[in-house]
């Protein structure tokens, strides 16, 4: 608990003890009134102060005003009737403060997940000067400076490892508990915790432009983007509160006047009591508090899972998504070419890969890199001579004295070497050694391990249609879509075509149905901005993705998309539950109070009880099912 919460709890305990003691103490008259007033001021002085400040600032109709009028009125009525029963006035204030404390605790609990994210903010950076480590403000570190990150410290700025190796804990950024190993030459993202070895990192960005700064700015600004539900409740409260105040005034005045006109006793005390009870019942705290809290808890729960939502308006829009459009590369596939098969080779597969990797050793093409990775050993260029790169065909070289050709079917035809066609999906590298066909190697963009499961999870989460956009050839795109179960695929698209295709898909949406576009943040900014909701995957370290997207997934796990949608559904469900429950109980109790069938204790339940239940329901949004 915070210092403020502890102080409030102490006031509640003191007031409760004093109220219980006064109930049994045989004191009467002015002494009794004085003791009850002291108890009332202990528990309610801050509410009276806020109500007074509100009146002075022209903001009369709020919950503080309602509580102040109701409790002061109850005191005045008890004094007028000389009943000495001041318990109800104090009980109303006491239980109201209990509700406020509970609400404060709930907000604090939901802030913990945001605070955990805020813990990624580094306090300092280590710079080596004259053989000693000096701590400096991260803002003062220039781009290109070598900083030292010791075990247990956070990486303060994005950079590249120039010395050392270690294991990083990225859970605060991605929600993923599995550590990541880094070595010399690997990129480091600010906010990660160094767990084992000492790392020397050359910074590639200024602190203000680093990943951690971008994320913190995003989270800090999320509360400023209100959902339609929050706007509705805020507008509703601005109209509702004055209406019920005037309604209470009418309830206190009109029935007695009508009775007097009819020649009956006005029963002023009875109707004023009902009006005061009406005010307590009508307090809109349950709605005003629980609705923003539900969204706040939803955003907090999502952030704990490595899902950063820029505002409650995006959370609300996400709950209405019925079409999810993927940019294939980097979302459903890894975007990295890998050797997936070796066919029709009488030669040992590893030997064929060795010939291919050595023949392609002078090329920086992604296909060449994938062959070298599949070979898995250091390339000895002294074994290779006479390398010739034939544009659009492949390469020829002499490896260990053997003529080697590696390329497409055109190269085989040019060399007059018979070859086998391949029906596998991917890029086919035909190999010839010593003028004889040696087989072919299949290279393709690898589908992510959980991509198929992610598409299925989206349908279970209420998504009606999944669409894949790609610049790949139709054969490749159709094969990936069929493997993953994607409903619709559009292939051979240029970057500009993707925006047009999303425009077309948006035009097909009906009613409140929304469209989400999922990209990896690379060249996706126009499409991310055009969709109803833009989701960037694997955005750790991508400034463009964090800027352009409405929702940022900090790792590249496609299952996170369905999880984000489930979080939004749960959050919006809680919001609607609270609205219906609070309004139903409020209006029912208001009617019962007006006709004299509910007293002040029923009003306390309608106010504090409903608020506590609504807040309890709201903090359910913090819990995210795995």
Go through each PLM region and give its residues.
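Soluble-to-membrane junctions at the N-terminal ends of transmembrane alpha-helices
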Residues: 1-16, 34, 48-75, 216-250, ...
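Transmembrane helix-loop-helix hairpins at the membrane interface
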Residues: 2-124, 235, 242, 270, ...
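Membrane-water interface of transmembrane alpha-helices in multipass transporters/channels
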Residues: 29-37, 60-68, 81-92, 232, ...
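Conserved catalytic phosphorylation-site environment of P-type ATPases
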Residues: 57, 63-71, 173, 273, ...
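Juxtamembrane coupling segments of multi-pass membrane pumps/enzymes
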Residues: 65-66, 91-151, 182, 309, ...
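Conserved cytosolic catalytic loops of P-type ATPases
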Residues: 116-209, 313-356, 398-399
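P-type ATPase nucleotide-binding
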Residues: 339-465, 474, 486-502
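Conserved ATP-binding TGD loop and adjacent catalytic N/P-domain core of P-type ATPases
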Residues: 401, 427, 433-577
